[in-house]
């Protein structure tokens, strides 16, 4: 028989989920193209990438599709509209899933929440945004979750490091911002970071600052150790020579004093010599520690009880530059209920993750088998010709690849 208390909690949970306010939910089912607008950004430069509608090369459900970047060295910009709302007095939950099938070297997997002033056809890298959230990978140095909040027209990066997932499987990223100015970041329904908007972003000036008028007192002693005034230099200390004749040295048998002069033994370092005498150190009884200016209220600080509020959210978008394409987005959610978001994640990612992992492992196994079939001995006869051809194209290929990677890092550094 079910525990009455557990049953009550379960019913309360269902009631809470049923009352969740969903502002936007996109599972990329039929008709998704009517809900999403592809931007004209970068089209004139022929560097705008196209999206594929697919479940990917490996998946847990071939019918669960999303949109995937399909062209290398391209910019991507696409957005969807929802009824304008403010999160004042509400919890804001922003969640989506992303999979880097291409084993991403440098590129983003983040999404943006945009205000009502956004022009979807012009949406691009310079378009102001309210929130930018999601994974970002570039080389060995950058493998983190971005959580960038716009406050007073300035973008503020989170000060804490939140590592992102770097494999080739689907992962769910969730950002929760609450009316009490606290937040949580989850990956695959597991909380990875939590804290306060006040402390983990520099949205406001600090409440306290060092007193600029404070001066260190003249008698403030910062020396932790001092020479021992009772310590005395031993008698004869200064008479100890730095070097002494080598006691093991022997006069050569063929040494002729008349011809070679009087023989003297070479000198060696004196093990008794201790250098210039210094009194030993003792704890300073007057030590007060390192002086610090006292903290005072910052006259420039003004609290904002609505620091968490975004008053006119109306669009969600993806804006990326990718050297290597293959990133797949799915199951985008904007709501006010973290429990509903968790449920959606379990219904989609959670239901399919094991099957997806098995499909990926099978694909990797087949790939290894295909590669092992290639016998290097079969190509020995053509090796010289191939080397000549490779040499001719090597410089051009490498320079093109290097230029593209440098461009990717430049774009990444502008974030």
Swiss-Prot record:
Entry's localization field: Endoplasmic reticulum lumen
Ranges for region 3 X approximate repeats: 261-299
GO BP annotations, alphabetical order: protein folding
Biased composition (Acidic residues): 377-397, 404-415
Annotated motif Prevents secretion from ER, positions: 412-415
InterPro entries: Calret/calnex, Calret/calnex_CS, Calreticulin, Calreticulin/calnexin_P_dom_sf, ConA-like_dom_sf
Swiss-Prot/TrEMBL domain comment: Can be divided into a N-terminal globular domain, a proline-rich P-domain forming an elongated arm-like structure and a C-terminal acidic domain. The P-domain binds one molecule of calcium with high affinity, whereas the acidic C-domain binds multiple calcium ions with low affinity. The interaction with glycans occurs through a binding site in the globular lectin domain.
Free-text function comment from the UniProt entry: Molecular calcium-binding chaperone promoting folding, oligomeric assembly and quality control in the ER via the calreticulin/calnexin cycle. This lectin may interact transiently with almost all of the monoglucosylated glycoproteins that are synthesized in the ER.
Record-given protein name: Calreticulin
Taxonomic lineage of the native organism: Eukaryota, Viridiplantae, Streptophyta, Embryophyta, Tracheophyta
């Amino acid at each position: 028989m079910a525990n009455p208390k557990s049953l009550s909690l379960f019913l309360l949970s269902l009631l809470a989920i049923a009352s969740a306010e969903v502002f936007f939910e996109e599972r990329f089912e039929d008709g998704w193209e009517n809900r999403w607008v592809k931007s004209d950004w970068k089209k004139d430069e022929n560097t705008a990438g196209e999206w594929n509608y697919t479940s990917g090369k490996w998946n847990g459900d071939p019918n669960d599709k999303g949109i995937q970047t399909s062209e290398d060295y391209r910019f991507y910009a696409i957005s969807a509209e929802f009824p304008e709302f403010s999160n004042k007095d509400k919890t804001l939950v922003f969640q989506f899933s992303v999979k880097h099938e291409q084993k991403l070297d440098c590129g983003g997997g983040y999404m943006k929440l945009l205000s009502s002033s956004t022009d979807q056809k012009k949406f691009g890298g310079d378009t102001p945004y309210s929130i930018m959230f999601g994974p970002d990978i570039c080389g060995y140095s950058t493998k983190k979750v971005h959580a960038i909040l716009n406050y007073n027209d300035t973008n503020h990066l989170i000060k804490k490091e939140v590592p992102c997932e770097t494999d080739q499987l689907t992962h769910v990223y969730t950002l929760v911002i609450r009316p009490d100015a606290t937040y949580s970041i989850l990956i695959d329904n597991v909380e990875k970071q939590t804290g306060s908007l006040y402390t983990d972003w520099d949205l406001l000036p600090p409440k306290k600052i060092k007193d600029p008028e404070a001066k260190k007192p003249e008698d403030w002693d910062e020396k932790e150790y001092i020479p021992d005034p009772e310590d005395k230099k031993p008698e004869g200390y200064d008479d100890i020579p730095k070097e002494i004749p080598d006691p093991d040295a022997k006069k050569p048998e063929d040494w002729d004093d008349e011809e070679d002069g009087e023989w003297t033994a070479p000198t060696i370092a004196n093990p008794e010599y201790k250098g210039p005498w210094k009194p030993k150190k003792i704890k300073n009884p007057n030590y007060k520690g390192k002086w610090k200016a006292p903290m005072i209220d910052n006259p420039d600080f003004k609290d904002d009880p609505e620091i968490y509020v975004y008053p006119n959210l109306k669009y969600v978008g993806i804006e990326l530059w990718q050297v290597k394409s293959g990133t797949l987005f799915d199951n985008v959610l904007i709501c006010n209920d973290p429990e509903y978001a968790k449920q959606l994640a379990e219904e989609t990612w959670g239901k399919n993750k094991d099957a997806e992992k098995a499909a990926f492992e099978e694909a990797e196994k087949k790939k290894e088998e295909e590669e092992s079939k290639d016998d290097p001995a079969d190509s020995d006869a053509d090796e010289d010709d191939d080397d000549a051809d490779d040499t001719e194209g090597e410089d051009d290929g490498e320079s093109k690849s290097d230029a593209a990677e440098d461009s990717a890092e430049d774009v990444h550094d502008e974030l």
